[in-house]
């Protein structure tokens, strides 16, 4: 939203920003919900995938479209992106780590940081599934407490480091550990629905 004409209108800017936050939160919640149902369905058929099989399936599902999207974006970008510094950004996007640094976050596309977080969630999703399946309520509570602690620790560290740039806070509050509650709450909602629906 930076530099846009509506930025000077506080009410409009706040609504647009809030809408974006709500959209991202729903995206993560639905991702957790969908992953839980997918794994639960596989387990019901007696073929719950191991970590490698799960990641292989996820990669096949998201990587082709994701890489095509990045490649198309790069075709229309400045040739500076193909410098030594630019290659750092390209590598970060192709390895789903663009959200790790304020330098690469949003450098090719401002929305694709969510794919980095989603991919990192996939890396731990099979383990979270087992915890949520065992006790969805405890898992949800623990995830909320963990996320609050992580967010507080990040803000405190950045503040003590003398960093006042809001964009840096924006980036480091959008990591998988600071969005974990969204994913787990989505999984917990699916677990609750499955348990009540099976009665």
Question: What are the functions of these language-model segments?
Answer:
Residues 1, 62, 74-78, 97, ...:
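Phosphate/oxyanion-binding loops and surfaces in catalytic or ligand/nucleic-acid-binding neighborhoods
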Residues 2-8, 158-162:
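Short, positively charged
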Residues 7-16, 164-171:
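Membrane-interface segments at the starts/ends of alpha-helical transmembrane spans
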Residues 17-28, 38-77, 84-96, 119-122, ...:
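Transmembrane alpha-helical segments and their boundary/interface "anchor" motifs
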Residues 28, 47-50, 88-113, 127-199:
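Aromatic-enriched alpha-helical transmembrane segments of multi-pass intramembrane proteins
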Residues 34-35:
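Short beta-strand segments in beta-sandwich/barrel cores
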Residues 72-81, 149-157:
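C-terminal TM-helix exit segments that contain a strictly Trp-centered aromatic cap at the helix terminus
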